[in-house]
Amino acid sequence: KTTRAYLKRVNEVVALCQPLQALNITELPREVHKKGDHTGNFDARPLLAAALQGHDIGLGSESGMPAVADPGSSVVRAAHDLGIEVIALTGPVSLLLALASSGLNGQSFAFVGYLPQEPNERAKRIRELESLALRTGQTQLFIETPYRNAAMMQSLVQTLQPNTRLAVCSGLTLTRGVCRSETIQNWRHQPAVADN
């Protein structure tokens, strides 16, 4: 639904090669969205039938970049396995925008996805990531849904050491995006987080 709406807007500026109604738009199964598709359990080969017949296909994402912090790696992996050429194209990717805006190490970083929702497990994972960052200098990137931002921020402020630097970036692909990078000591005095 969102893809069709987007392509309709694109078509108003630049004509599509085919009428919108002629395009076959398929969504990855819900299970792939919930559990990810990096495990290799999802067989994406049937989605590539048109490409095997010589047609161009695309893989899109509603927010971010397919296969990077979003589902899609199974489709890309299947394309490689089937000998289909893969060309990655991107617009603004919030992870890289956040890293570039943070003032943290952009030469060595890791994206660790979502942290656990259960408070004790989340605090344990935060301590592990902080230890890794302090030991290696590697920036640790993670994401959270807006409705869990307050709980995440509370865990971070309570768990991290006072001198640890934390950058919180939100809505960076929007016109009113924000990024704030402070030590935990400073965050404890002003812990407000944007809800973009």
Residue ranges: model-predicted function:
Residues S61, V86-G91, F142, V168:
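General beta-strand structural signal in soluble alpha/beta enzymes
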Residues H55-D56, R135-N196:
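A contiguous loop/helix-start segment that scaffolds small-molecule binding in enzyme catalytic cores
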Residues D43-I57, N105-Y114, Q185-N196:
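A polyampholytic, Gly/Pro-enriched intrinsically disordered region
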Residues G36-L48, R125-L129, V178-R188:
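Short, surface-exposed amphipathic charged segments that create phosphate/polyanion-binding patches used
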Residues K1-I87:
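Class I S-adenosyl-L-methionine
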